[in-house]
Amino acid sequence: MSARPEVVYVLPNKLGGVFSYVHQLLAHRRPDGFSYAAVRTQNARDRDHNIFEPLPADRDVRFEYSLPPENVHAVLRRLALTIPFGPGVIVANDWIELALTSIHDTGRAVFAINHGDMDFYYNLAVRHQETIDAFVTYTEQMARRLRELLPDREESIFLLPYGVDIPRAVRQPKPGPLRVLYVGRLSRDKGVFDLPFIDRRLRDVGVNPVWTVQGGGPDEDELRTAWADRLDVRWFGQRDKADVLRMYEHHDVLVMPSRQEGLPVALLEAGAAGVVPVVSDLASGIPEVVESGVSGYRPAVGQIGAFAEAIAALDRDRTRLEAMSGAVRDVVATRFNAIQRTADYQRLFGRWRDLKRPRPKNPKLRYGSRLDKPWIPNIAVRLIRSTMSRR
């Protein structure tokens, strides 16, 4: 009897859109002949908060490592043990699993997900093109860029929007101060240090919203210090998915001043609940959801005044707020329903045998330094690097 094929999602175990993306695809899958696994990687050297919320997979595995000081080959050998040889698909969301599949044959097709309109993901696609069988992304902008970078692989590039739950309960109008929400990682690349300045600009023009910040991250303490003049900001920390979804019902506006994005999960989840987005005007995928002035606003990146002006306009014109609330919910419900979109992914997984390409004869690992050699014991590499770091 042949082994049952398995789809293995490998992803970083930290707060962010990648975790939510995988959660949605696992939660809404239908029986299809595959078993499903999640391998969550976490580098002890990262400053990000790990996630303890379970994923709805048949196998949910945590894989811990420390790079540096470990030998990358030793780390990859351990990672390979979490993905036994067999038929199916590896869904790669980060660099470490692509490094693994570049030198280790798992028997599975490798589908690489491009999560952002940024060099990090495009460079991964180009670097590992010989061992990636399918490139998947979810916005027109990112698909177009992949085709430009990989003109010989156009038939292997798939545009598959993902979806979110469309809740029955949506936000309801409430008189009083505007209820403004930020959801996501608290890190500089998300533009979170713009939030105190946006708030101060709003207060300068007589708008005093109620602020909620949901999430954690490496820059949380610094952000709290930068916003110390506002004692009533509600810091909700890192919550599980169900709590976050309920939170949307009690807010009016989602503020996302990101510097770079793909198509943020928080944007779709908030939009599905009727929370109006005020989000950086990034070409990556934001315009596919937010038509400025209709289903939200898209201020230019880093333009504090434009963000404040958009929020103030919604505060002063509650009729406009409600119209935009209905418009963004309609967009998300029509185009980004999780049940429909997950079925598209499952159909692609079902083609894994046809999409799987021959592996290169002499694969090479494109990571590491002189100490990262397969024949050097991990304990020796750790000792050398720890000694060097103390000098």
Give residue ranges: language-model regions.
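Short alpha-helical donor nucleotide-sugar binding micro-motif in glycosyltransferases
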Residues: 238-239, 246-251
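A conserved mid-protein helix/loop that constitutes part of the nucleotide-sugar donor-binding site
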Residues: 19-24, 178, 182-201, 218-222, ...
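Donor nucleotide-sugar binding/catalytic pocket of nucleotide-sugar-dependent glycosyltransferases
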Residues: 131-169
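Short His-centered aromatic/hydrophobic patch
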Residues: 91-97, 114
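Conserved acidic donor-binding segment of nucleotide-sugar-dependent glycosyltransferases
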Residues: 292-293, 297-304, 313-318
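Nucleotide-activated donor-binding/catalytic signature segment of Leloir-type glycosyltransferases, i.e.
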Residues: 222-239
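Aromatic "clamp/platform" in nucleotide-sugar-dependent glycosyltransferases that forms part
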Residues: 259
